[in-house]
């Protein structure tokens, strides 16, 4: 290499080095854009419940402007100050600005499903004369066992249509909702009891079909059938035997207690709502993870049923979680509405695993 060639090569390298400062690489530019982009506490996806979306940017002293109609945000758009409440299909666009200069724009798409949508994803079966619905986790993997949530409905959902137990409330829908299944893929089982005087997962009516709680602690015929349905499902699918859960409301609340007392080693945890257990037997549940709910002004199932049950469990050394809604809220015999909306409830349930005491 002669002197002239060396000189040209050195000059070229100096120019190239200088240009690297004037024109950052594509990779660097992308990294800068990524750093400047906003982040959302709730990712894009499908949801059943309304969401509170918190926004954040790593850029110091930056301002976030957003729109919820899919249009490009400007400094004239809504300035982000607090979490954004979203409950309908929404395209959220967020732009990060600093000194009136837009650094990035991010798009988040939220789509919502209805209870009917969720119900349609349940399979429909009948076993030994009892209708039941079963949700199978999407994209379940062969050879992998998944948890199962058993839901026992109340007296108003009795029948043979195999639908009311899914559509009347969130007792089954919640566990099969997109956001819960994404975090905790699981089976959801919802049997349906007969609409008869002695029908239901607890005996709450007399021969005149009037509310009568005299025999409410008896193991009802339909609860026996529900247990058989559960056993059938447990042997037919790959269920994690350490993560079988029970929840129920009203008649189903009593049934949830009764199943756990009769088969104390079957369930990992339980969520009984507006129900109760025989205080003389409730001590059996001392080591069971329980989160119970009841309304103080319940006009159908008196609050004493829940209080007496919880006190009996505590006396036996148990530490059940118990949420009682004061009369001022007016929930009456519908405490399952706020109960199934309790923050952290689903995470709490799926965190429980059966022990072998």
Give the predicted meaning of each segment.
Residues 152-154, 294-295:
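The conserved beta1-alpha1 loop
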């Amino acid at each position: 290499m002669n002197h002239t060639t060396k000189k040209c090569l050195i000059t070229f390298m100096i120019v190239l080095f200088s240009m690297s400062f004037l024109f950052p690489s594509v990779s660097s530019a992308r990294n800068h854009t990524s750093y400047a982009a906003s982040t959302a506490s709730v990712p894009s996806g499908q949801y059943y419940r309304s969401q509170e979306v918190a926004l954040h940017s790593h850029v110091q002293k930056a301002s976030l402007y957003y729109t919820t109609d899919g249009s490009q945000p400007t400094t004239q758009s809504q300035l982000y100050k607090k979490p954004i409440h979203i409950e309908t299909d929404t395209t959220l666009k967020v732009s990060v600005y600093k000194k009136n200069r837009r650094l990035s724009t991010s798009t988040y798409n939220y789509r919502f499903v209805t209870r009917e949508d969720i119900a349609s994803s349940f399979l429909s079966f009948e076993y030994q004369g009892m209708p039941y619905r079963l949700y199978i986790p999407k994209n379940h993997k062969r050879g992998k066992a998944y948890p199962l949530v058993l839901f026992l409905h109340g007296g108003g959902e009795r029948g043979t249509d195999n639908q009311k137990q899914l559509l009347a409330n969130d007792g089954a829908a919640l566990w099969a909702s997109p956001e819960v299944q994404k975090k905790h893929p699981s089976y959801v089982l919802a049997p349906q009891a007969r609409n008869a005087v002695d029908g239901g997962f607890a005996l709450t009516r007399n021969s005149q079909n009037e509310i009568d709680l005299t025999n409410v602690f008896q193991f009802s015929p339909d609860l026996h059938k529900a247990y058989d349905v559960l056993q059938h499902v447990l042997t037919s699918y790959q269920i994690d035997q350490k993560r079988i859960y029970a929840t129920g409301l009203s008649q189903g609340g009593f049934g949830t207690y009764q199943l756990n007392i009769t088969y104390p080693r079957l369930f990992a945890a339980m969520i009984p709502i507006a129900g109760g257990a025989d205080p003389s037997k409730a001590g059996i549940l001392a080591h069971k993870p329980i989160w119970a709910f009841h309304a103080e002004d319940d006009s159908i199932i008196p609050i004493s049923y829940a209080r007496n049950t919880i006190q009996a469990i505590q006396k036996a050394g148990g530490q059940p979680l118990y949420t009682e809604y004061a009369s001022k809220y007016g929930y009456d015999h519908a405490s399952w509405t706020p109960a199934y909306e309790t923050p952290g409830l689903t995470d709490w349930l799926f965190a429980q695993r059966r022990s072998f005491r």
